[in-house]
A protein has these predicted regions:
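Short active-site neighborhood of thiol/selenol oxidoreductases, capturing the structured segment around
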Residues: 49-70, 75-76, 88, 92
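Short acidic, S/G/P-rich loop/turn micro-motifs used as interaction or catalytic elements
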Residues: 65-68, 97-98, 159-160
Length: 174
């Protein structure tokens, strides 16, 4: 009889422990260890004239060795030649192929302002590298149209949301 009472009490104790443990994990918030990017893309730009520019402007995230990125840059350049009121363009490159930046601009008429940031920097708690800003949500090339500080259109990758110069022209000159 005592053995059954101990077994019964032990079973109740185990059930209570499991219920409390489950309730604890369900009700207490779990802190994510991943870095969260709450900043706007434009906040990573280190060009005051671009940041302070009123009106439309275009921010690009490119890799210097990326063929799709170079094609997007050439398309932007061609579109800019068609209209004098084309927005200013600022490019952020990753440092993985920094030595290819001069040849990236071969065949491009305009001189675009650009900056280079580290490809990856997981040693800090800050979001301060190309991968942390763009990955995993966005693929190269990333082209973003702003009106002042308000994002109007974001193109990225090479699939459904890829950069489309005709779509950009329609938005700019409608």
């Amino acid at each position: 009889k005592k053995s059954k009472d101990y077994r019964h009490n032990f079973s109740i104790l185990i059930i209570l422990f499991l219920l409390i443990s489950t309730a604890m994990f369900a009700l207490l918030p779990i802190k994510s260890s991943a870095k969260k990017n709450d900043k706007s893309f434009v906040s990573y730009v280190e060009n005051e004239s671009f940041l302070n520019a009123e009106g439309r402007k275009i921010l690009c995230f490119f890799d210097a060795g990326c063929g799709h990125c170079q094609q997007a840059a050439k398309s932007l350049d061609s579109l800019s030649l068609l209209n004098e009121s084309f927005p200013s363009v600022h490019i952020i490159f990753s440092d993985t192929e920094e030595e290819k930046i001069p040849e990236f601009f071969d065949g491009i008429t305009n001189e675009y302002q650009y900056q280079v940031i580290p490809f990856a920097n997981y040693d800090t708690d800050e979001i301060d590298s190309y991968m942390e800003i763009t990955f995993p949500d966005y693929d190269n090339p990333v082209v973003i149209l702003y009106d002042g500080s308000r994002q109007i259109r974001l193109y990225e990758g090479t699939s459904n949301n890829e950069f489309n110069v005709e779509d950009l022209a329609r938005i700019l000159y409608k």
